Amino acid sequence: MCVEGDEHMFRIAICDDERQFRKRIHDILIEYMNENDILYEIDEFESGKDFISLGINLAKYDIVFLDVNMDELDGMETAQKIRKVSNDVFIVFVTAFITCAPQGRIQRRSYKIYSEK
């Protein structure tokens, strides 16, 4: 989805292997952006592998919401690969499984936000 204009447009990626959680994050973001008249573009990815396949183009995103627990390439591994391309992408980790959350790993790597789904 894209809302265009002359001002800065926030480019947001949602990377989660569960469709219902991608939709929930997407809906929350749309509501917030529209209420605050913020221009945005939101893209969704089913896996870390799909997102990383963008290569250098993943640096176009301002914010990436990453599920911590995904098959093939989990959120932490995906974040490491993002950092190899760009230090400017703001990463938000999300998870539905708080008991499995790698909070220490997130803090040690100086990522800023961690949120339960």
Description of each model-found segment:
Residues 10, 40, 89:
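Switch/coupling loops of ABC transporter nucleotide-binding domains
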Residues 19-43:
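Two-component/phosphorelay signaling modules centered on CheY-like receiver
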Residues 16:
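Conserved acidic carboxylate
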Residues 26, 44-63:
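Acidic, metal-coordinating helix/loop segments flanking the phosphotransfer/catalytic sites
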Residues 1-11:
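Non-catalytic signal-transmission and effector/linker regions of two-component phosphorelay proteins
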Residues 23, 53, 102-103:
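Alpha-helical elements of the RecA-like P-loop NTPase motor core of helicases
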Residues 12-13, 63:
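Hydrophobic "anchor" residues on beta-strands that sit immediately upstream
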Residues 61-117:
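CheY-like receiver
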